[in-house]
């Protein structure tokens, strides 16, 4: 039996001298205000126990990590037809690249780059008003984490809406190819709000637990997705979850994961645990600098890498 709390504490101790490393995302004004000298880690094991250290109870903007939850909703709604509109291949380009999109006729490379996530949001929006789609996501994440206090930070959403020119360009470009079915402002309104979900490491580690437990949420006992779908979402997180740093993350950490420019990373150790780390300073490819290091240390200490201990 592993001493998970001991491992979590030792990782936190290792990160303490390095607080403040990396560069906070400054192109979203609200994120630029976040104190970089923070680090939190939470692990929720498949028996439902959560272990925390550091700033694990401080809410932060989960940003692109929300794409995992939106993809889960879209697959529940549209099934495999989702893949008619978005691919499943790593991009090798920056998360907001428009060049690849033009070359591939408006079909984004995968659901975790911005263009792909916007298409996924468009699918979830089908049959809904924007407010209803936002509400559906919020209810879903609260249900997964078993926590009704999770909320959306409207200030962050407005900040993104005011500065998200590249996302407007991507959305209009895909609309011109017929791969966006709703008005751009509706789809992006939902997208900016989903990215502004505010969660703690503890909440996020619980929300991702269904992916570590064959699609079943051990907190509620309910099946969220099939075993097969959980496996496939994990596969996409492993290959595409960290922008053009996905290969490097697989090499060093060896766990399915999804990062966000708010400094969070949600990772999955299938059969063992769901993990959330957060530190606002980002590395050169937009992933949490300390978060990535902490997960590499975790994989080494636990032997949880999907490629073997």
Swiss-Prot record:
Q: Name one Pfam family in it.
A: Glutaminase
Gene, per the UniProt record: glsA
Biological classification of the source: Bacteria, Pseudomonadati, Pseudomonadota, Alphaproteobacteria, Hyphomicrobiales
Question: Does the keyword section mention Hydrolase?
Answer: yes
- What is catalyzed by this enzyme? L-glutamine + H2O = L-glutamate + NH4(+)
PANTHER family per UniProt = GLUTAMINASE (PTHR12544:SF29)
Write down what this protein is called: Glutaminase
Per UniProt, the keywords (alphabetical) are:
Hydrolase
Quote the record's binding site residues for substrate. Answer: 64, 114, 160, 167, 191, 243, 261
**This enzyme's EC code(s):** 3.5.1.2
Member of which family?
Belongs to the glutaminase family.
Describe its partners and assembly state: Homotetramer.
GO MF annotations, alphabetized: glutaminase activity
Q: Report whether Cell membrane shows up as a keyword of the record.
A: no
């Amino acid at each position: 039996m592993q001493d998970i709390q001991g491992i979590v504490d030792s990782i936190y101790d290792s990160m303490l001298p390095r607080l403040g490393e990396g560069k906070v995302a400054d192109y979203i004004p609200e994120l630029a205000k976040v104190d970089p000298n923070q680090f939190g880690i939470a692990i929720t094991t498949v028996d439902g126990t959560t272990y925390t250290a550091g700033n694990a109870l401080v809410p932060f903007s989960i940003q692109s990590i929300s794409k995992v939850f939106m993809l889960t909703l879209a697959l529940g709604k549209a099934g495999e037809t989702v893949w008619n509109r978005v691919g499943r291949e790593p991009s090798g380009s920056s998360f907001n690249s428009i060049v690849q999109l033009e070359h591939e006729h408006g079909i984004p490379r995968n659901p975790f780059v911005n263009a792909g996530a916007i298409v996924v949001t468009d699918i979830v929006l089908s049959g809904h008003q924007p407010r209803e789609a936002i509400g559906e996501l919020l209810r879903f994440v609260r249900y997964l984490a078993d926590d009704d206090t999770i909320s959306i930070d409207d200030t962050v959403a407005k900040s993104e809406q005011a500065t998200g020119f590249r996302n407007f360009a991507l959305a209009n470009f895909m609309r011109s190819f017929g791969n966006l079915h709703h008005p751009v402002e509706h789809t992006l309104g939902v997208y900016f709000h989903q990215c502004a979900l505010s969660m703690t490491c503890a909440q996020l580690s619980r929300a991702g637990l269904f992916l570590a437990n064959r699609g079943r949420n051990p907190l509620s006992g309910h099946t969220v997705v099939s075993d097969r779908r959980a496996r496939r979402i994990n596969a996409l997180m492993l290959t595409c979850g960290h922008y053009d740093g996905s290969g490097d993350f697989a090499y060093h950490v060896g766990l399915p994961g999804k990062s966000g420019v708010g400094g969070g990373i949600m990772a999955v150790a299938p059969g063992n645990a769901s993990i959330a780390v957060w530190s606002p300073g980002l590395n050169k490819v937009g992933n949490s600098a300390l978060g990535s290091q902490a997960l590499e240390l975790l994989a080494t200490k636990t032997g949880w890498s999907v490629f073997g201990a």
